[in-house]
Amino acid sequence: MPASAPPRRPRPPPPSLSLSLLLVLLGLAGRRLRAEPGDGAQTWARFARPPAPEAAGLFQGTFPDGFLWAVGSAAYQTEGGWQQHGKGASIWDTFTHHPLAPPGDSRIANVPSGAPSPLQPATGDVASDSYNNVFRDTEALRELGVTHYRFSISWARVLPNGSAGVPNREGLRYYRRLLERLRELGVQPVVTLYHWDLPQRLQDAYGGWANRALADHFRDYAELCFRHFGGQVKYWITIDNPYVVAWHGYATGRLAPGIRGSPRLGYLVAHNLLLAHAKVWHLYNTSFRPTQGGQVSIALSSHWINPRRMTDHSIKECQKSLDFVLGWFAKPIFIDGDYPESMKNNLSSLLPDFTESEKKFIKGTADFFALSFGPTLSFQLLDPHMKFRQLESPSLRQLLSWIDLEYNHPQIFIVENGWFVSGTTKRDDAKYMYYLKKFIMETLKAIKLDGVDVIGYTAWSLMDGFEWHRGYSIRRGLFYVDFLSQEKTLLPKSSALFYQKLIEKNGFPPLPENQPLEGTFPCDFAWGIVDNYIQVDTTLSQFTDLNVYLWDVHHSKRLIKVDGVVTKKRKSYCVDFAAIQPQITLLQEMHVTHFRFSLDWALILPLGNQSQVNHTILQYYRCMVSELVRVNITPVVALWQPVAPNQGLPRLLARQGAWENPYTALAFAEYARLCFQELGHHVKLWITMNEPYTRNMTYSAGHNLLKAHALAWHVYNEKFRHAQNGKISIALQADWIEPACPFSQKDKEVAERVLEFDIGWLAEPIFGSGDYPWVMRDWLNQRNNFLLPYFTEDEKKLIQGTFDFLALSHYTTILVDSEKEDPIKYNDYLEVQEMTDITWLNSPSQVAVVPWGLRKVLNWLKFKYGDLPMYIISNGIDDGLHAEDDQLRVYYMQNYINEALKAHILDGINLCGYFAYSFNDRTAPRFGLYRFAADQFEPKPSMKHYRKIIDSNGFPGPETLEKFCPEEFTVCTECSFFHTRKPLVAFIAFLFFAFIVSLSLIFYYSKKGRRRYQ
């Protein structure tokens, strides 16, 4: 480790006069222009447009060499030992021991001490007991692999009375031991002088920070720390979050010392804090920097705010919001020594004035910009009126860009950042981990994409502790602390393991599994498109009236019916259905080889049985499939799909209990028989049931549904397969379920449980054992739930193996966690918390785009059910309501199909086809590859991109061996007789030809003979 703080990144040296022209060119092309106050307002316009999908998702890259990786803690939150070894009382000791909490305080909840009184407030008396566990804490640092550790010195521990005098030797010894241990580990300290815990003696004697005299006491305390510890400390923080200290300590009273004063008092305290900070900076700069070589700053917290509407007024309000929180302290220090103009204009009677000498004294008193950004400081303690009716957002990247523009490109050290989980959450803190990932990724984007000079990042905090106004109701540590235990052992959470891996890799380096694969699919690969319910329009394009009419030309100018005269009934043809040909044309334009759609059971059999058959609808479907075959597109037909109303069932069956009624299974088998009989000559791929949704289906309904599928399969297998030579299976929705915490065995078990309930419930009886998954049965039995029916041995034999291929629909990936964090998304039935990685790209309907989930679910199915032929029967994403340029879908298809290729080539998955969802926006709004507007279908960019992939049969590259695929021709089933009997056909043709020639000769010579006779 270097002995001194790393130097600032080098700036270009001033060029000589002889290079003045070059200076101008470099200044325009390379040097960053000087920023001025107010320039930060450009940030909102810059980020107003959504980023391209490839930029919005996972960002791969590493941080600059020498980047500072830190973790932090604060004295009162973690040290404990509040009366040990001569420590004086702080304002937080007094504040937490007070029986009445201020308004909005929740510290009484979740008291860790186990005290019987529910009204006893939580305190930091013991907290994480860091005062007695230096080795324990530093071992945690070693596990993380951080380069820096931020901690604060308890003012009352080194100076019990707060003022200069004889320091507390035991307090000094504790911090020396900590610093020495850090030196042994090669971890550099980042030391905060004041983290909210003012000695109570100074509060009583002077009224705390409301008294200007406190600045001198703070200077004396800082001098003591610089003298005793400065040789080992290269980064100093004077005051942590002066906004919270001033506003919530002295104006709202939400935090210690709990003074519910006027806003004027809050602004006065902030004024004194700025002067106190400046005094300490000048002290270090004059007396200690020459020998110690460190840097000093102040930790400023901020929120981020977005305009309700992208108007000049809303943007000005956002700028004002940041001025009132961050700019309140940042502008005096980093710009000109005075408050933001927006504050002075709005608070002229409340805001104290700086003298000219004070402005000069405060200006420039920071060697780097120390930024805090987190839930408590940036959001929970943000006064509502300081939002100015705009929308706060946890967007760290935008804030970093704003600071860069507003304060002239400072070096930024993020000295506090993180999130929180519930106080009941133990070590699987998935929510915290993904927020940590999001914030670090946004920091990397700010560095790489926006050019912001961020030099370090601090995760908050090292361990669970006392969380100020929230007490112990939340946890923010990377290490878990059992506050009820005597030992207070630190146990790494998932977030700690994640942070350790991230530091080890210095960011998010590109991983081999995330790289696209070049290659092509087999020649007979099925490229399909899905339209769950095609446009059924039985209106004929020709006249169907059999009557004869005369045109009354001379009088009424109308058609007059001729009574008693009718024409012969005209035979109907498929071309009569006007709606079919436009759909066929669009499919041909897409170059797909297969088209999947669902039949409407309720339209074909309105009563659910063959007592009333809609032959017109059947003729329409028959024409649809025959026309598809004619143009060499293979129809893939689903018999049933759950859809409102009536779950896609005939109304009578729905009223009689739907799938709860065993009779529905028998009715389905008869319906299937009719469809096979009427359509089977043209349909070679059948789906019995498409995506039966297991999450809202009862066990008895699922039981009957499985039997219905099996009955239909056996009908086809025994009565139609030999003549029609088709294949039949069921299509199951198979979204991937990923453990939220990849390091947690419990989360892995939870993920497997959900997969069995979501997919295995219907898949295991068909593709596996013939019975329900044992995981499912065992879980329900443990909870005394005996509603899952049992199959008889005959039923198992009936159901098992009723497939010719495995068809799955896949759209997204869901994370599951064993910890109950969000009651709204918690599934009590399966004891699982569903969540998402907030760094994932999402569609407008908040469906996560996770391409690698498709590959994982394909491998899971292969592992569970063997090397079966598989079809991805549906895969797609929604776009914006008026999105003509559907770049999200282009990105989605490109990456999901590439993952399918990886599964086929790298994993040996027997993948036979891919079907994109959906055909058009008319039948599936916001999902279509064709846009429907003004009664016309217009191709979206995604359709053209899909066509390109189809034409290439995948993703061929320079290293890919070209695969020759012979062109396929339409097979005419009606002409098969002639194809198999070519010699006979030739002989008949010869006889016909000879007959014609003979007839011609006879005619010729007979005519010639008549002429001669005449």
Curated annotation (Swiss-Prot):
The keyword Nuclease does not apply. Belongs to the glycosyl hydrolase 1 family. Klotho subfamily. It is an enzyme of class 3 (hydrolase). Residues 517-955 are annotated as: Glycosyl hydrolase-1 2. The lineage of its organism: Eukaryota, Metazoa, Chordata, Craniata, Vertebrata. It comes from Macaca fascicularis (Crab-eating macaque). Glycans are attached at N161, N285, N346, N609, N614, N696. May have weak glycosidase activity towards glucuronylated steroids. However, it lacks essential active site Glu residues at positions 241 and 874, suggesting it may be inactive as a glycosidase in vivo. May be involved in the regulation of calcium and phosphorus homeostasis by inhibiting the synthesis of active vitamin D. Essential factor for the specific interaction between FGF23 and FGFR1. This is Klotho. Its EC number is 3.2.1.31. Contains 2 glycosyl hydrolase 1 regions. However, the first region lacks the essential Glu active site residue at position 241, and the second one lacks the essential Glu active site residue at position 874.
